[in-house]
């Protein structure tokens, strides 16, 4: 008898990708094997995102197709996990009665138990707040080079636009020993890089007894043999301390790429967002990072068209982007999320105005990023090879320690997982091209090898 097959479809953030890898590992421990096509799978799992409306609507579009399959073949199992599942709960079953299991993010490690209930003939909704247990099942990781490692779940912030605290629950930090054990496991499996994940990762450890922090965790895991690079995301400006900055500058494996969302450049908008800092505090933070690590790569998130945002306030966002000089910036027009305070405010910005502001911001972002990239022309960068260039399989693709994508000639299969010196021969806003530096030729400077640039 053939083994049952599964297929996962993941929407949203890195946390969701890490959760999907863990759920895939659980399914394989139960005897499932991956399907090549979601239309052929015996079990289809949607790991959903509700941070913006368009992501949520994509979920329902996919669900409609799978519901038709299930009506023809009731043996198919349909699961919706993640933030849409947590937000909608029973309402999701009423909208798509073909579903077998609706489960929030806090239940990822309990998937096996929930599936047992489904196998017993039950339609299950699991969205009640629970503590997230440690799970010894190995995730089925998508990459063979870099591994996602969850270190803190949930969020205690109350930003007026954000649904995350409502759907992912309060902060729950993992024990340092459990995190190190997982990193040691991926190192033994041949991984060279880990990315530590959390909604607000720099809040790590304040809920533990005894309390600890992200700087201490980085020191604790830094000595794991085999791991060459350590990254972390996503950071909140309020918790990004000088101790953390100094620790990152000191530890050679910790990459000098920092993702720190600012969301808006106007203090008035930041106050309405309930972000807990000013644009001047954000500027000072980035300045301090660059004092310790002048070549640090800085990325962020920004929202345009927040309720009540004026043109003058939007101009402050443009000015901040220009002044900081971001290397990457994730931008979005404000999307009202049900259950958040900002969604109920009367001073919503018209859609056409939001679209116009987003286009103007994106143009500036591309200009600034292109100028930042151009500084690397002719430099030799250490690149961790991830695999083939998706658009040219004969080329290899990898990332610098500053998280810039680099394309270069080479055998992707042979080089995958290797750290290679690459001279940058062409720069673009969000990617680079280069050539491998052969033995005996110019090598990266010590600063480029010893720290993430």
Curated annotation (Swiss-Prot):
<keyword id="KW-0808">Transferase</keyword>
<comment type="subunit">
    <text>Monomer.</text>
</comment>
<feature type="domain" description="Radical SAM core">
    <location>
        <begin position="141"/>
        <end position="372"/>
    </location>
</feature>
<comment type="function">
    <text>Catalyzes the methylthiolation of N6-(dimethylallyl)adenosine (i(6)A), leading to the formation of 2-methylthio-N6-(dimethylallyl)adenosine (ms(2)i(6)A) at position 37 in tRNAs that read codons beginning with uridine.</text>
</comment>
<keyword id="KW-0004">4Fe-4S</keyword>
<dbReference type="InterPro" id="IPR005839">
    <property type="entry name" value="Methylthiotransferase"/>
</dbReference>
<dbReference type="Pfam" id="PF01938">
    <property type="entry name" value="TRAM"/>
</dbReference>
<protein>
    <recommendedName>
        <fullName>tRNA-2-methylthio-N(6)-dimethylallyladenosine synthase</fullName>
        <ecNumber>2.8.4.3</ecNumber>
    </recommendedName>
</protein>
<dbReference type="GO" id="GO:0051539">
    <property type="term" value="F:4 iron, 4 sulfur cluster binding"/>
</dbReference>
<keyword id="KW-0819">tRNA processing</keyword>
<keyword id="KW-0411">Iron-sulfur</keyword>
<dbReference type="GO" id="GO:0035600">
    <property type="term" value="P:tRNA methylthiolation"/>
</dbReference>
<feature type="binding site">
    <location>
        <position position="49"/>
    </location>
    <ligand>
        <name>[4Fe-4S] cluster 1</name>
    </ligand>
</feature>
<feature type="binding site">
    <location>
        <position position="162"/>
    </location>
    <ligand>
        <name>[4Fe-4S] cluster 2</name>
    </ligand>
</feature>
<dbReference type="InterPro" id="IPR006638">
    <property type="entry name" value="Elp3/MiaA/NifB-like_rSAM"/>
</dbReference>
<dbReference type="InterPro" id="IPR007197">
    <property type="entry name" value="rSAM"/>
</dbReference>
<feature type="binding site">
    <location>
        <position position="159"/>
    </location>
    <ligand>
        <name>[4Fe-4S] cluster 2</name>
    </ligand>
</feature>
<dbReference type="GO" id="GO:0035596">
    <property type="term" value="F:methylthiotransferase activity"/>
</dbReference>
<feature type="binding site">
    <location>
        <position position="13"/>
    </location>
    <ligand>
        <name>[4Fe-4S] cluster 1</name>
    </ligand>
</feature>
<feature type="domain" description="MTTase N-terminal">
    <location>
        <begin position="4"/>
        <end position="120"/>
    </location>
</feature>
<dbReference type="Pfam" id="PF00919">
    <property type="entry name" value="UPF0004"/>
</dbReference>
<dbReference type="GO" id="GO:0046872">
    <property type="term" value="F:metal ion binding"/>
</dbReference>
<feature type="binding site">
    <location>
        <position position="83"/>
    </location>
    <ligand>
        <name>[4Fe-4S] cluster 1</name>
    </ligand>
</feature>
<comment type="similarity">
    <text>Belongs to the methylthiotransferase family. MiaB subfamily.</text>
</comment>
<dbReference type="InterPro" id="IPR023404">
    <property type="entry name" value="rSAM_horseshoe"/>
</dbReference>
<keyword id="KW-0408">Iron</keyword>
<keyword id="KW-0949">S-adenosyl-L-methionine</keyword>
<dbReference type="InterPro" id="IPR006463">
    <property type="entry name" value="MiaB_methiolase"/>
</dbReference>
<feature type="domain" description="TRAM">
    <location>
        <begin position="374"/>
        <end position="438"/>
    </location>
</feature>
<dbReference type="Pfam" id="PF04055">
    <property type="entry name" value="Radical_SAM"/>
</dbReference>
<dbReference type="InterPro" id="IPR002792">
    <property type="entry name" value="TRAM_dom"/>
</dbReference>
<feature type="binding site">
    <location>
        <position position="155"/>
    </location>
    <ligand>
        <name>[4Fe-4S] cluster 2</name>
    </ligand>
</feature>
<keyword id="KW-0479">Metal-binding</keyword>
<dbReference type="InterPro" id="IPR013848">
    <property type="entry name" value="Methylthiotransferase_N"/>
</dbReference>
<dbReference type="GO" id="GO:0005737">
    <property type="term" value="C:cytoplasm"/>
</dbReference>
<dbReference type="InterPro" id="IPR038135">
    <property type="entry name" value="Methylthiotransferase_N_sf"/>
</dbReference>
<dbReference type="InterPro" id="IPR020612">
    <property type="entry name" value="Methylthiotransferase_CS"/>
</dbReference>
<keyword id="KW-0963">Cytoplasm</keyword>
């Amino acid at each position: 008898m053939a083994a049952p097959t599964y297929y996962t479809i993941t929407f949203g953030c890195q946390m969701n990708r890490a959760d999907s890898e863990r759920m895939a590992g659980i399914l394989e421990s139960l005897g499932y094997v991956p399907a090549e096509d979601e239309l052929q799978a015996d079990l289809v799992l949607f790991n959903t995102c509700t941070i913006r409306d368009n992501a949520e609507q994509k979920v329902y579009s996919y669900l409609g197709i799978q519901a038709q399959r299930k009506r023809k073949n009731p043996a198919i199992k349909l699961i919706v996990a993640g933030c849409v599942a947590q937000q909608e709960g029973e309402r999701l079953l009423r909208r798509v009665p073909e579903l077998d299991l609706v489960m929030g993010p806090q239940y990822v490690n309990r998937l096996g138990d929930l599936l047992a209930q489904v196998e017993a003939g039950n339609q299950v909704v699991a969205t009640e707040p629970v503590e997230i247990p440690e799970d010894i099942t190995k995730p089925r990781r998508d990459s063979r080079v870099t591994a996602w490692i969850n270190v803190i779940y949930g969020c205690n912030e109350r930003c007026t636009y954000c649904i995350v605290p409502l759907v992912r629950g309060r902060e729950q930090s993992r024990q340092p020993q459990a995190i190190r054990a997982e990193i040691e496991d991926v190192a033994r499996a041949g991984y060279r890089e880990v990315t530590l994940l959390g909604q607000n990762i720099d809040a790590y450890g304040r809920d533990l007894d005894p309390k600890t922090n992200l700087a201490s965790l980085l020191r604790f895991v830094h000595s794991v043999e085999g791991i060459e690079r350590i990254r972390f995301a996503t950071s909140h400006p309020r918790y990004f301390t000088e101790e953390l900055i100094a620790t990152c500058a000191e530890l050679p494996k910790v990459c000098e790429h920092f993702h720190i969302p600012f969301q808006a450049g106007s203090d008035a908008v930041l106050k309405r967002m309930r972000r807990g800092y000013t644009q001047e505090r954000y500027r000072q933070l980035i300045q301090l990072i660059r004092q310790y690590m002048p070549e640090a790569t800085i990325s962020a998130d920004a929202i345009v068209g927040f309720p009540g945002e004026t043109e003058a306030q939007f101009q402050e966002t443009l000015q901040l982007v220009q002044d900081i000089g971001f290397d990457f910036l994730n931008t979005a027009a404000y999307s009202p999320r049900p259950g958040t305070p900002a969604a109920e405010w009367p001073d919503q910005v018209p859609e056409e105005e939001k679209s116009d502001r987003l286009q103007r911001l994106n143009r500036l972002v591309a200009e600034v990023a292109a100028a930042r990239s151009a500084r690397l022309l002719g430099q030799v960068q250490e690149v961790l090879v991830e695999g083939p260039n998706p658009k040219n399989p004969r080329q290899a693709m990898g990332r610098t320690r500053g998280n810039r994508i680099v394309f270069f000639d080479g055998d992707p299969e042979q080089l995958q997982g290797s750290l290679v010196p690459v001279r940058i021969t062409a720069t673009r806003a969000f990617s680079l091209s280069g050539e491998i530096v052969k033995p005996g030729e110019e090598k990266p400077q010590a600063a480029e090898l010893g720290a993430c640039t």
